[in-house]
A protein has these predicted regions:
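Short beta-strand segments enriched in small/hydrophobic residues
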Residues: 18-20, 58-76, 183-190
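Alpha-helical structural signal in soluble globular domains
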Residues: 43, 88-92, 139, 198-210, ...
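Residue-level detector of anion-binding/catalytic polar loops
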Residues: 15, 50, 94-99, 146, ...
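Alpha-helical recognition/docking segments in bacterial nutrient-uptake
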Residues: 61-174, 234-241, 253, 312
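N-terminal helix-turn-helix DNA-binding module of bacterial transcription factors
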Residues: 1-62, 340-345
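Hinge/beta->alpha junction and helix N-cap segments in small-molecule ligand-binding domains
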Residues: 72-84, 102-110, 161-171, 187-233, ...
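Flexible loop/turn connectors
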Residues: 229-346
Length: 346
């Protein structure tokens, strides 16, 4: 039999109004004596009462449900980084009493129907298709739904949360330049996703600080990571004074590919070749020292709730909330040939 507020009130010996005030954290509940509130909460526990959130939302017109719109077909949404971001979001919603409704963007029309049907006022979009991003933005804007994009967005009229990747890659270039590296190669996906563009812009900006340009011949861009091996082998076949001495990879998997290829060619790591990945998803597990960028994935997910509910103003650019990253540097050994007093790649 379903437990009602009246049942709890009878068990606790108080009015139904008092029970409602305590369960809803109403301001009037503070006027109740501590022992009365404790008695009500104990009655709730003993009765096994479960609040009907859907009914409460209909009655009050206030929805505490966040729609999590996911492009499941994209590999990045199923990756390790995405898992940490979503974990942060789920932890935040659980702590603040919000429900989460998972929506698969493979059927956009059905998702839109559900947003209307359940009167959802908050939505977080984790998608990489510009078409999906645009359609979702238009729909939420027309219905006054608070929307936050995660990691990528083609729009500037809704907030985006991610890390400051351009600043991170620029700092890596500075580190490599200080060690004497001049021939710096980039290993990246062949796409125009925002974070790929930002990371590439960061490398270019870092080189520009020292009067250098990103050499297009030292960019390996492929959708399939396996296709990088051909580029890497051609570079490592070059004479030592001509080949790249440092690699900035846009994820740790690609950094591992550079490491594997370099070791096959008998190149000492990190003495003769410096490698940086991104994301800290794999570099920490590698036996050989490979640098990486540690991103605050869980904090990004937690921030989504605050952004949607208007509890934060910590944005670094219009509608962009970018978290600083930590560069985890696998420093060369003391006996390394690549030291601050010797220039590599000249």
């Amino acid at each position: 039999m379903r437990i009602t507020l009246a049942d709890i009130a009878k068990k606790a010996g108080v009015s139904t109004a008092a029970v409602s005030q305590v369960l809803n954290n109403h301001a009037h509940a503070k006027a109740l004596r501590p022992e009365t509130r404790a008695k009500i909460l104990q009655a709730v526990i003993e009765s096994g009462y479960s609040r009907n959130e859907a009914a409460a939302e209909i009655r009050t017109g206030l929805s505490k449900t966040i729609a999590l719109l996911l492009e499941f077909s994209h590999s990045a949404v199923r990756g390790a980084a995405a898992n940490e971001i979503l974990l942060g979001l789920l932890n935040a919603t659980a702590q603040h009493g919000y429900n989460v409704r998972i929506c698969n963007l493979s059927n956009l029309e059905l998702v839109q129907q559900e947003l209307v049907k359940y009167n959802i006022r908050y939505a977080a979009c984790f998608a990489f298709s510009p078409l999906l991003q645009e359609e979702i933005g238009n729909f939420c804007k027309a219905r006054d739904i608070a929307l936050c994009y995660i990691e990528d967005s083609c729009r500037n009229d809704f907030p985006l949360v991610y890390s400051d990747d351009q600043a991170a890659t620029r700092e890596i270039v500075r580190k490599l330049f200080a060690e004497g590296h001049r021939r710096i190669a980039v290993v990246k996906p062949e796409d125009d996703i925002r974070y790929s563009v930002e990371r590439c812009n960061g490398v270019a900006a870092g080189l520009q600080e020292f009067g250098l340009k990103l050499n297009p011949l030292w960019i390996s861009a492929h959708h399939d990571p396996v296709e990088h091996f051909a580029d890497l082998e051609s570079w490592f076949h070059l004479p030592e004074e001509e080949r790249p001495t440092a690699f900035i990879c846009f994820d740790d998997n690609r950094a591992a590919q550079v490491l594997i290829t370099a070791l096959r060619f008998g190149i000492r790591i990190p003495d003769s070749c410096r490698i940086f990945g991104f994301g800290n998803t794999l570099a920490r597990q590698l036996y050989y020292p490979v640098g990486t960028v540690v991103q605050a994935f869980e904090k990004m997910g937690e921030a989504v709730l605050d952004i949607l509910t208007g509890k934060t103003e910590n944005k670094t650019a219009p509608a962009r909330y970018l978290f600083p990253s930590e560069i985890k540097d696998a420093q060369p050994k003391p006996d390394s040939e690549t030291t601050s007093g010797k220039t590599c790649g000249i």
